[in-house]
């Protein structure tokens, strides 16, 4: 009888834990502390704004819609409640924007990405390291990793204390054209998600990276609300199309023309 009670109590505890775990994340899990060394947080006096990616010791790449006044950038952070010894905070020196032709989609403007030069270079540390620009575009069907401090509920804002990561698939661009009306026939964007739904980037993840086969291939641009709907994948800026332009800006060639 005692054994039966013990087993019953263990079963209740397991069910309780499983229920809490399913409520904590939407299609993702807490990132390993060592897998997001390039992930940065953009914030100001109003609070958390966006994510971004450190691409070298002085430059961060993020989404243009993350542009705000008095931005500060935190690097090396994992938990909002427990400070890493090597966390660093920087302010922008200047920002340069990637611009594209405006489409009929209401959520798309003329600016897609923001390249931020830091006022001071970042110091090397165990939890901070840049993620280099891609050498080639990703292939449809690739399994990609999304990460960020965005909301973990598809219907309400519920920001986690630690970044969450999820694996999603790189889809054909036509899937996004069918899912989101008004997209042009060709685009410098990537389409990524899970067709069955349940895994997705969400509010607050904007500007964060899409990492495919270890390469920084996309910047989260926008998606639908609620997040994680079936057949409603997210849209990401295609980093490989802008790699040469970004490298020219970093090298000091401010007159270089952005790809059309």
Swiss-Prot record:
GO terms for molecular function: serine-type endopeptidase activity; toxin activity. SUPFAM superfamilies: Trypsin-like serine proteases. GO terms for biological process: killing of cells of another organism; proteolysis. Its main location: secreted. Expressed by the venom gland. Glycans are attached at residues 44, 81. Optimum temperature is 30-40 degrees Celsius. Residues 25-251 form the Peptidase S1 domain. Keywords: Blood coagulation cascade activating toxin, Cytolysis, Disulfide bond, Glycoprotein, Hemolysis, Hemostasis impairing toxin, Hydrolase, Myotoxin, Protease, Secreted, Serine protease, Signal, Toxin, Zymogen. Residues 1-18 form the signal peptide. Inhibited by benzamidine and partially inhibited by EDTA. Disulfide bonds join 31-165, 50-66, 144-212, 176-191, 202-227. It comes from the Eukaryota. Its EC number is 3.4.21.-. It holds the Pfam family Trypsin. It is an enzyme of class 3 (hydrolase). Residues 19-24 form a propeptide. Thrombin-like snake venom serine protease that induces blood clotting in vitro, defibrinogenation in vivo (by intraperitoneal injection into mice), albuminolytic and fibrinogenolytic activities. Preferentially cleaves the alpha chain of fibrinogen (FGA). Causes hemolysis in the heart, causes apparent hyperemia and lymphocytic interstitial pneumonitis in the lung, causes necrosis and inflammatory infiltrate in the liver, and causes glomerular congestion in the kidney. Also provokes a drastic myonecrosis. Negative results: does not present azocaseinolytic activity. Does not provoke vascular lesions or hemorrhage. This is Thrombin-like enzyme bhalternin.
């Amino acid at each position: 009888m005692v054994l039966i009670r013990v087993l019953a109590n263990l079963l209740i505890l397991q069910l309780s834990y499983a229920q809490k775990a399913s409520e904590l994340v939407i299609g993702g899990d807490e990132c390993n502390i060592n897998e997001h060394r390039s992930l940065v947080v953009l914030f100001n006096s109003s609070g958390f704004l966006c994510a971004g990616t450190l691409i070298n010791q002085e430059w961060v790449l993020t989404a243009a819609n993350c542009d705000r006044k008095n931005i500060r950038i935190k690097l090396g952070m994992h938990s909002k409640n427990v400070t890493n010894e090597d966390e660093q905070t920087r302010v922008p020196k200047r920002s340069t924007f990637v611009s594209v032709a405006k489409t009929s989609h209401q959520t798309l403007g003329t600016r897609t990405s923001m390249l931020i030069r830091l006022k001071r270079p970042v110091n090397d540390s165990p939890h901070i390291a840049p993620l280099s620009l891609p050498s080639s575009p990703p292939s449809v069907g690739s399994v990609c990793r999304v990460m960020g401090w965005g909301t973990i509920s598809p219907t309400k804002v519920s920001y986690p204390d630690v970044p969450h990561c999820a694996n999603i698939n790189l889809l054909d661009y036509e899937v996004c054209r069918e899912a989101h009306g008004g997209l042009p026939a060709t685009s410098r964007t990537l389409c990524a998600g899970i067709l069955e739904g349940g895994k997705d980037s969400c509010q607050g993840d904007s500007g964060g990276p899409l990492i495919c086969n270890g390469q920084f291939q996309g910047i989260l641009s926008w998606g639908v609300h609620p997040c994680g709907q079936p057949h409603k994948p997210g849209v990401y800026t295609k980093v490989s199309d802008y790699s040469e332009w970004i490298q020219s800006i970093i090298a000091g060639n401010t007159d270089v023309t952005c790809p059309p």
